[in-house]
Amino acid sequence: MPRLTQIGKDQAHPNAQAIYKLLFKDRDPVVQPGTDTGTPGNWWTVFAVSPDAFDHAVAGFQYYRGKRKLDPKLRELGQTRAGWGRGSQFVYSQHCKASRGVGLSEEQIQSIPHWQVAECYSPVERAVLAYTDGMVLQGGRVADGIFAALKKHLSDVEIMELTYIVGMYDMHAMISKTLRLEYDDVDDRIVEVAAPTGASSDVMRMVDQEKKE
């Protein structure tokens, strides 16, 4: 379950109601969840808790889906890699699908997790993936050599668009995991695994040197 309250159809603000109508038809998505793409749809119902946040996020979607200088294939490489790098199954899964929609090959999509050793990417695609890793995995610490490689292929406008969109999707991946939305509603796998009954609590005692008499 998401960690925040979900806003139903009757309580949603006008912009959310309009999108609910598109996604869920006449259903209340809290009572009858599910979208045509197979997601529960609770990203929308949780973001609707704050109408301003909902509208701001939707404006971000409209930004990247609008008329941009950046090639949509490069955009989706950045978004999908951001989802993978941040560990968001929701963002990664949704943008694998979106990547097919803009014409990336199945090999390119399936190789995003291990792009460094894949041979299916052009120099500009590799530069975009490396730049995304610098932003997401290194917290914005993009090496000069990576930026120089990107500048060989993209204009300042295209780099600004890429930076904004990747940063936005890094944020969405973090929010999705934090609030346990959609496919990121999973338990943390880093927990203690119980030892057998009667086992010593000193798990590293076998490496101790025997004390000399």
Question: What do the PLM-derived regions correspond to, one by one?
Answer:
Residues 1-72, 191-213:
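Secretory/endomembrane lumenal or extracellular ectodomains immediately following the signal peptide
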Residues 34-35, 52-57, 87-92, 127, ...:
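Short acidic alpha-helix initiation/capping motifs at coil-to-helix transition points
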Residues 55, 76-102, 106-107:
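Conserved alpha-helical segments that form or flank metal/cofactor-binding pockets of metalloenzymes
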Residues 100-107, 176-206:
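C-terminal end-helix/capping segment
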